[in-house]
């Protein structure tokens, strides 16, 4: 083989061939990696020209930064759903397209696709992984499918039914605190603060059978969960903090790791203790025995769960699912219930009708307690809850990453590799889907008015194969807490209108403040 002279690089004739070969191999590998990427970008750009897009900031940033986590950001999303009605294309920088979807007909092929075709996008959810591990929220593929099958029995009504007593007790504790604070007539309260503690109180009892009395005194575990949620939301707002190496060096990163350790240690200790005390018998017999003795908690069900091959969950898997349930169950329910009270405070006529419905249901009942069978006997209260979840959905959007082309109903195609942003908020506020979408009108959810409406027009708990497994739990808790609250208190709006703030869930800047007035015993 003839040698090429590379003496100008300081290499002799004997070294020239190997260096040239190495250079050629390296360049070929680089081109083999880059060229398909470049081709995919240009091919996707060509195919995405069929999707309209709002005016970008500029060619470099695209639409990056146009939607902030603020009231103005939500108003911008509303304007997108009014303008485009179904979908639009959004560019994050010059290379990364996102398809935003606002219409049930266009949501359907994405959200109902198999989990392998449209898995959750990991860009944002990865911030939760050190805390939640491979639980249902973050796992994919066969592991997600296996866990989903194994966890479904944990949300059967036979398991949920005894939890209603816990919901009553936790709500009673919150109300006793409100009565003390309103002893002089009325109290101005941040609903998120009080209701978050109430939902966490219920969850600790339902998941771990542990009573931390967190509504009355500080709890390290509860404080850690609240801090983790706040830290993840704050990290999402800063692009610089998206870099793991940098984030771990910051004060927030150190606080995040410390809070994770505390939460994991608590969950691990409960699992170890329960492993020691769990009866060594068949799953069904153990479930029946524990059901007779006390309320089955989430850990019990996870420890007794077996897949179709008779394999149980590992302790690591159980911890991930328990931590996921604590995360997913407290914030979303607290957001939903807080905004429901806000909407009923703004519409006293609906509030009073709900109150009368509850009074009629509990007439002459002592003590005043909501039971499982009562939950189906509150139709108007349920309509008010659903309308609030439409107007103020706890989760404003969900993301999916297409692993293959997805055909939309009008023939357009979302290319493989493109992220889809399903806008729950935009769909719920789309005038093409909901007439007068900014008006709070519970009668939208009257059975007669819902005829002909797509089930995907209302998706506060998502939909499809990856919908919220705990939605019956959440709805039951909201019904109990709302019914008892309206029975005992009149809820009034604050002087200052709240500014909405979408983070992990839909919050209000500076808290969601309302006034509560205890109702006299005679008013009952």
UniProtKB/Swiss-Prot annotation:
UniProt entry keywords in alphabetical sequence: Endoplasmic reticulum, Heme, Iron, Lipid metabolism, Membrane, Metal-binding, Microsome, Monooxygenase, Oxidoreductase, Transmembrane, Transmembrane helix
Compartmental location: Endoplasmic reticulum membrane; Microsome membrane
Annotated pathway: Lipid metabolism; leukotriene B4 degradation
Record SUPFAM superfamilies: Cytochrome P450
Signal sequence extent: none
Disulfide bonds, paired cysteine numbers: none
Positions with a binding annotation for heme: 468
Keyword DNA-binding (UniProt): no
Reaction it catalyzes: leukotriene B4 + reduced [NADPH--hemoprotein reductase] + O2 = 18-hydroxy-leukotriene B4 + oxidized [NADPH--hemoprotein reductase] + H2O + H(+); leukotriene B4 + reduced [NADPH--hemoprotein reductase] + O2 = 19-hydroxy-leukotriene B4 + oxidized [NADPH--hemoprotein reductase] + H2O + H(+)
Xref: Pfam families: p450
Gene Ontology annotations of biological process type: arachidonate metabolic process; fatty acid omega-oxidation; leukotriene B4 catabolic process; leukotriene B4 metabolic process; omega-hydroxylase P450 pathway
Main location: endoplasmic reticulum
Cofactor: heme
PROSITE patterns hit by this protein: CYTOCHROME_P450 (PS00086)
Superkingdom of source: Eukaryota
UniProt entry tagged with the keyword Aminoacyl-tRNA synthetase: no
Role noted for this protein: A cytochrome P450 monooxygenase involved in the metabolism of the pro-inflammatory lipid mediator leukotriene B4 (LTB4). Hydroxylates at the omega-1 and omega-2 positions LTB4. This oxidation step leads to LTB4 inactivation, which is postulated to be a crucial part of the resolution of inflammation. Mechanistically, uses molecular oxygen inserting one oxygen atom into a substrate, and reducing the second into a water molecule, with two electrons provided by NADPH via cytochrome P450 reductase (CPR; NADPH-ferrihemoprotein reductase).
Family: Belongs to the cytochrome P450 family.
The protein's name: Cytochrome P450 4F3
Organism: Rattus norvegicus
């Amino acid at each position: 083989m003839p040698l090429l002279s590379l003496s100008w690089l300081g290499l002799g004739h004997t070294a020239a061939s190997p260096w040239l070969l190495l250079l050629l191999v390296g360049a070929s590998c680089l081109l083999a990696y880059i060229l398909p990427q470049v081709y995919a970008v240009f091919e996707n750009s060509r195919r995405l020209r069929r999707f309209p897009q709002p005016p970008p900031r500029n060619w470099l940033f695209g639409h990056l930064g146009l939607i902030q986590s603020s009231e103005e950001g939500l108003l911008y999303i509303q304007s997108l759903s009014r303008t485009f009605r179904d979908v639009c294309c959004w560019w994050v920088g010059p290379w990364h397209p996102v398809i935003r979807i606002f219409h049930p007909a266009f949501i359907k092929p994405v959200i109902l696709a198999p989990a392998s075709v449209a898995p959750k996008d990991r860009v944002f959810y990865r911030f939760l992984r050190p805390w939640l591990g491979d639980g249902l929220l973050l796992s994919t593929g066969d592991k997600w499918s296996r866990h989903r099958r194994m966890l479904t029995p944990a949300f059967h009504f036979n398991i949920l039914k005894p939890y209603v007593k816990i919901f009553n007790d936790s709500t009673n504790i919150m109300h006793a605190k409100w009565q003390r604070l309103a002893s002089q007539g009325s109290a101005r309260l941040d609903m998120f603060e009080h209701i978050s503690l109430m939902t966490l109180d219920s969850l600790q009892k339902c998941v771990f059978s542990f009573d931390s009395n967190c509504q009355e005194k500080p709890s390290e575990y509860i404080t850690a969960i609240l801090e983790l949620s706040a830290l993840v939301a704050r990290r999402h707002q800063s692009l610089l903090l998206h870099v793991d190496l940098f984030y771990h060096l910051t004060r927030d990163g150190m606080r995040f790791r410390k809070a994770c350790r505390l939460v994991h240690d608590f969950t691990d200790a409960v699992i170890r203790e329960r492993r020691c005390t769990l009866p060594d018998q068949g799953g069904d017999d153990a479930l029946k025995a524990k059901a007779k003795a006390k309320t089955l908690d989430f850990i019990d069900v996870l420890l007794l769960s077996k897949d179709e091959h008779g394999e149980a969950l590992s302790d690591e898997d159980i911890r991930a699912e328990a931590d996921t349930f604590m995360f997913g169950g407290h914030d979303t329910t607290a957001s939903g219930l807080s905004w429901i009270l806000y909407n009923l405070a703004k519409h006293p006529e609906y509030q009073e009708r709900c109150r009368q419905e509850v009074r009629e249901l509990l007439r002459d009942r002592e003590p005043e307690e909501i039971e499982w069978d009562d939950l189906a006997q509150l139709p108007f209260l349920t309509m008010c809850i659903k309308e609030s979840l439409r107007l103020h959905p706890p989760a404003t959007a969900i993301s999916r990453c297409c692993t293959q082309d997805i055909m939309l109903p009008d023939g357009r195609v979302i290319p493989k590799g493109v992220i889809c942003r399903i806008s729950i908020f935009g769909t719920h506020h789309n005038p093409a889907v909901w007439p007068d979408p900014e008006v709070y009108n519970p009668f939208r959810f009257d059975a007669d008015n819902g005829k002909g409406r797509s089930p995907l027009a209302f998706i506060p708990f998502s939909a499809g194969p990856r919908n919220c497994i705990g939605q019956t739990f959440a709805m039951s808790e909201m019904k109990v807490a709302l019914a008892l609250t309206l029975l005992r208190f009149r809820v009034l709006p604050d002087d200052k209108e709240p500014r909405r703030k979408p983070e992990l869930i839909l919050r209000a800047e500076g808290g969601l403040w309302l006034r509560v007035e205890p109702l006299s015993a005679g008013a009952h």
